[in-house]
Design a protein with these regions (language model features):
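Detector for C-terminal structural segments
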Residues: 1-12, 48, 52-61, 80-196
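DNA breakage-rejoining catalytic core of tyrosine-based enzymes
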Residues: 14-20
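Charged, low-complexity surface patches
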Residues: 18, 53, 74
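Immediate post-signal peptide segment of exported/extracytoplasmic ligand-binding proteins
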Residues: 22-43
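Short, well-ordered beta-strand elements
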Residues: 39-49, 71-74
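Short glycine-rich hinge loops at helix-strand junctions in the catalytic core
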Residues: 68
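Conserved active-site histidine-acidic residue motif and adjacent donor-binding/catalytic loop
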Residues: 75-79
Length: 196
């Protein structure tokens, strides 16, 4: 868990900050006034772009049911999904992969405060500061430290959380030369040549 999926440069596993503890979850829900007489219900929207999205949404729904929370899955086409998340429309959470991250700041355009795509709708300029510090820092060790601090901050505030990236595979044989792996972000074969 974190703001970037495992395998992305400077990834830090922050799962320990949000351990799976159903008893504690039920207690927190009770403290917030939710229980059998007043269950917490939320909308979990996803789209039809990839078949794995509705599977992930179903897993989340089942996990929520274990702590007596109801997740109502709303499955829509990709265009409807985009139009909905870009507005203050009826959704609470969504499942999407947006793009496989190449760096921590690949998705800054959807999580900085001035962004029209600020999906968490937060106003915390510390997020902007983290991105700026990360982008300016050239020392790999200092950059990694900023990334760790930012991921821990984001998990604490729950501004953005990623459980995993979507399954995406590309295969290149050893005889395929000049192939560059860019995750799911871009797939280029225009400079590739075959070494016979």
């Amino acid at each position: 868990m974190g703001i970037i999926p495992p395998g992305t440069p400077d990834t830090v596993d922050v799962t320990h900050l949000c351990p799976y503890d159903p008893a504690k979850a039920k207690a927190l829900l009770a403290d917030a006034g939710y229980g059998p007489q007043k269950p917490l219900t939320f909308a979990l929207m996803t789209n039809t772009e990839k078949s794995v999205f509705n599977v992930i949404a179903t897993v989340i729904k089942e996990q929520m049911a274990r702590v007596r929370v109801t997740a109502n899955i709303r499955l829509v086409d990709k265009i409807t999904w985009m139009n909905t998340i870009l507005q203050d429309a009826p959704w609470d959470l969504f499942v999407e992969d947006l793009l496989s991250l190449l760096t921590l700041d690949s998705n800054a355009f959807i999580s900085t405060t001035p962004s029209a795509w600020n999906q968490a709708r937060h106003t915390d300029t510390k997020v902007d500061d983290y991105y700026a510090r990360y982008a300016r820092e050239m020392d790999p060790l200092k950059r990694k430290a900023i990334a760790k601090e930012f991921q821990e901050f984001s998990a604490d505030k729950l501004y953005w959380n990623t459980i995993s990236g979507s399954p995406f595979y590309m295969v290149a044989q050893p005889w395929m030369k000049d192939y560059v792996y860019n995750a799911e972000f871009e797939v280029h074969y225009d400079r590739v040549w075959l070494d016979k």
